Each structure stands twice: as structure tokens, then as C-alpha cells.
Swiss-Prot record:
Name of this protein: Ribose-5-phosphate isomerase A
GO molecular function terms listed in the Swiss-Prot or TrEMBL record: ribose-5-phosphate isomerase activity
SUPFAM superfamilies: D-ribose-5-phosphate isomerase (RpiA), lid domain, NagB/RpiA/CoA transferase-like
Disulfide partners: none
GO annotation, cellular component aspect: cytosol
NCBIfam families, per the entry: PRK00702.1, rpiA
Pathways per UniProt: Carbohydrate degradation; pentose phosphate pathway; D-ribose 5-phosphate from D-ribulose 5-phosphate (non-oxidative stage): step 1/1
Primary role: Catalyzes the reversible conversion of ribose-5-phosphate to ribulose 5-phosphate.
Entries under Pfam families matching the protein: Rib_5-P_isom_A
InterPro entries on file: NagB/RpiA_transferase-like (IPR037171), Ribose5P_isomerase_typA_subgr (IPR020672), Ribose5P_isomerase_type_A (IPR004788)
Ligand binding (substrate): 33-36, 86-89, 99-102, 126
Active-site residues per Swiss-Prot or TrEMBL entry: 108 (proton acceptor)
Gene symbol of the encoding locus: rpiA
Main enzyme class: isomerase
Source organism: Bordetella petrii (strain ATCC BAA-461 / DSM 12804 / CCUG 43448)
Length: 225
């Protein structure tokens, strides 16, 4: 039986195979953050001379890319990217996701918004019938912490400050358990509209375009309905 680490590697390798035909001297790839994205970055190193560069969704990923000699570009200097590749903490059959376990969801959303396609790479443990078992990360401007926490309680959540953590943007994370996520796009809009919220970890407006799900029987490919 494959370990979770081996499944993550399988998903990363599948993404590399999927993007290889797209590579070229003018191509820029968007790269996410997390343990599975790290494996994708490690594999991307062998293609570093076949693309113009990358845009990273976190300082962590930027450092890992640079460590492999892969060019990291500022998103402000990039007008288009064919793909953004990232993992997820949870994903459902509609390819809606919860992300932000690493606290990078704001930059992940920004980079993903510029890409033509979002490829999500996950192992089979991340596929769920309904989102919400994984607490929803919400990036919040520090002065709004209590006000946002009260609003999240009113929505049925149980927010907890992620102690000792500051985002790359200088903000805090509230991890919100107990939310009833029946309509992920609607909840994403509601939470993101709370004053003081930078963005939440729901990725449903839109979700991923393709999910490469690593299973004990190989890669299962899911497309957005």
C-alpha cells in the first residue's frame, strides 16, 4: 500500500506530465504552497531551462523555487499564465476547495486568478462529500480580530486564533471550525465581505478546473462540472 507521501508524489508527477507540453521559453507557471506543491516544485527543477519562470504564492515556495535555480517573477510583471498548480486541504466533487493550512490562501487566490487553468494536486484523503471538516482559515487584519470572530460565531463557526503565526501579508489567521458549508460559493462571498477579512480559504468562486487525485489504483482525474 502506498503511503500518503508516495501518493502526494504521484499527484505531483501527474501534474508535471500534464504541464510538460505547455512549456516553452515564454511560459510562466503559477506555483502554490504546501507539502504537495513542494514536491511539484522539486520535480519542476528538471524543466527550469524550458520555461521563462514561475510566480510563487508564498515566500516559502519562492525560496524553494529559487533554491532549485528556477526563476521567480513578480506577479506585477506577468500578464498571463497557462496554469496554476497547487494542493488543497479539502476538495469536493465540484472542485470547490478549502485551502490555507499553510496560511497562504490570499496570495494563492491572487496568483490563481491570473492563470488560465487551476490544477489541484491532492491525495485521495483530501476528497470529501462536503467541505468543512478541515477548519476554514480566514486571513484577518489584526485590528479586526474580535469583530470578525464575533461575525464568524454568528455564522455558526468556532473561530480560533492561529497562535504565533503571521501571514506573508502581515496579518493573522482565524481557523474556523463547525461551519455548515452547504453552499460554498455563497459562504465564500459572505465571509470575504466581512469588514477586516482579507480573504478566506474557500476556493469556490471558482474552484479548480482539474483535480489530479492520487489513489492506491493510480491517478483519478476530475474536471469541474
Amino acid at each position: 500500500m502506498l503511503t500518503q507521501q508516495e501518493l502526494k508524489q504521484q499527484a505531483a508527477d501527474a501534474a508535471l506530465a500534464l504541464i510538460e507540453p505547455l512549456l516553452g521559453p515564454d511560459v510562466i507557471i503559477g506555483v502554490g504552497t504546501g507539502s504537495t506543491a513542494d514536491l511539484f516544485i522539486d520535480g519542476l527543477a528538471r524543466y527550469r531551462d524550458r520555461l521563462r519562470g514561475t510566480v510563487a504564492s508564498s515566500e516559502r515556495s519562492a525560496a524553494r523555487l529559487a533554491g532549485h535555480g528556477i526563476t521567480v517573477l513578480d506577479l506585477n510583471d506577468v500578464t498571463s499564465m497557462p496554469v496554476y498548480v497547487d494542493g488543497a486541504d479539502e476538495i469536493d466533487a465540484r472542485l470547490h476547495m478549502i485551502k490555507g493550512g499553510g496560511g497562504a490562501q490570499t496570495r494563492e487566490k491572487i496568483v490563481a486568478s491570473v492563470a488560465d487553468r487551476y490544477i489541484c494536486i491532492v491525495d485521495e484523503s483530501k476528497l470529501v462529500e462536503r467541505l468543512g471538516s478541515f477548519p476554514l482559515p480566514v486571513e484577518v487584519i489584526p485590528m479586526a480580530r474580535q469583530a470578525v470572530a464575533r461575525a464568524l460565531v454568528a455564522l455558526g463557526g468556532q473561530p480560533r486564533l492561529r497562535e504565533g503565526f503571521t501571514t506573508d501579508n502581515g496579518n493573522i489567521i482565524l481557523d474556523v471550525a463547525g461551519l455548515q458549508i452547504d453552499d460554498a460559493p455563497a459562504l465564500e462571498l459572505t465571509v470575504n465581505n466581512l469588514p477586516g477579512v482579507v480573504t478566506c480559504g474557500l476556493f469556490a468562486r471558482p474552484g479548480a478546473d482539474v483535480a489530479l487525485l492520487a489513489t492506491q489504483n493510480g491517478i483519478r482525474r476530475l474536471e469541474r462540472p
